[in-house]
Amino acid sequence: MCSILGSKIIDISKYGIIFSSLSKNLGISGSTLVIGRKDILSRPKLINPPIVMDWQPYIHLQGPTPTIMSIYMTNMNIKRMIKRGGITYYNSLTFAKSQLFYNFIDNSNDFYINDIPKENRSRTNITFTVKNSIHLSKLFCETAKQHNFIGTQYHPSNPNKGCRISLYNGLELSEVKLFIQFMKTFQNKFNFNDLQNSSLSS
């Protein structure tokens, strides 16, 4: 949920409780956002819940000292988001960025491969491999870093699955276009070298 909060229109009435990190789009690390239905939050406790799941002290302003800096930074960021057009603006921006990226991958002649069904694809975290090769995917990430594009490797929990691009709110459409241009250059250079090697071997 933390990857889409602030970047996608969500009908929160469908949820009893939303429990999410503030990082990614809304703020910085260190705080958690809880959105809960009043009828759920006001229920008497039948058991002793874990402290992290007991929100009554916070509702009644009796909780421990909150992470002031994280909340302050989140407040500043949300004010900026509202000034730029709010959730409607960021919903459209995220959709445009993801569509642009997926269209490029899908039309790369299987050089860049995303094997997730289109109806299940994330608009925020896009994964792919280079020619379905972990070796080439790692080479891509290393080359991207040399060109000042950082954080293109897959999630640290599974680094051998290829590449990952996160299109959070902080990434502008122009920056996505710039990265796609790098991907085109990488692909063209690889295809050229591959063609040269084929010519030499023949």
Question: Where are these predicted regions, by residue range?
Answer:
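Conserved PLP-binding catalytic core of the aspartate aminotransferase-like
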Residues: I113-T143
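Short amphipathic alpha-helices in soluble, non-transmembrane regions
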Residues: S137-K145, L178-K184
